[in-house]
Structure formats: C-alpha cells, structure tokens
C-alpha cells in the first residue's frame, strides 16, 4: 500500500445513515449493488484482489480505474487502491479509498476518505469532491431499499 506523504491531501465525506453497518457493508461489497451507486466493477471483498471500476470515458479519463483490495474488515472497514489506468497510469493519480463504518445510537456513521492526491492532481481532486458527495448520497438510497 502506498502511504501518502506530507505533500498530498485527502478528501473526506461523512454521512450518518439510519441503517445497521451490516446493511451498508452489503452495498459496499456486493458487485451488483456497487454498480447501482458507483460504477460497473468486478470487485470481490478479498485482500489482494485486483479489480476495475468502469464507466463511460470522459475528457482526461479513459473510464477505467485500476484497484486492489487492501483491507477487508467486515462491517467495519474497507480499503482499496484507486489508480489511473492505461496511458494515464504513469502520470495520473494513485490514491487509496477507505470506508469506515462506526455504529451510532441511530444507525451508522459512514466515512469515506480518498487519500494521496498530489498537488498536480488538483483537477482530479475537484472531480472526486463532487463525485463522492453525490455517490455517498446514491449509496444511501441503495441501502435504504435493501431488506
């Protein structure tokens, strides 16, 4: 795992959800559910599993994110690398996404941190800030309709 240095920055999105951690964990770790709130994927909650998130390409992004599961602690913590792919792999961002689930009196505090943004990743940081805020909201909608 790459540790961010002092020159990097992190993006944090937190939201308290009125749902148990077990339910949120399902939406964070089951491929078809992940696709509903994030992107197409071949994720497996197994440390060392390499996988991709896939979306429609956009300017400055080929639509593929290369990842590896780094930490899988059921119902508590999930962490994976989040790296540029293809031609962008050499110069694009190499970050780590960590989800932390903390029980509260009324549900679960969901914390998403994407760490390791370098100064030259400012555009990616801004895009991630917008994207994660929206996607955490989408995650909550998926969780709300689970049994």
Question: How should each PLM-predicted stretch be described?
Answer:
Residues 12-13, 31-64, 77:
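Short beta-edge strand/loop motif at the mouth of beta-sheet-based domains
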Residues 24, 34, 51-53, 69, ...:
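Hydrophobic pocket/interface hotspot
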Residues 116-147:
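A conserved amphipathic terminal alpha-helix motif
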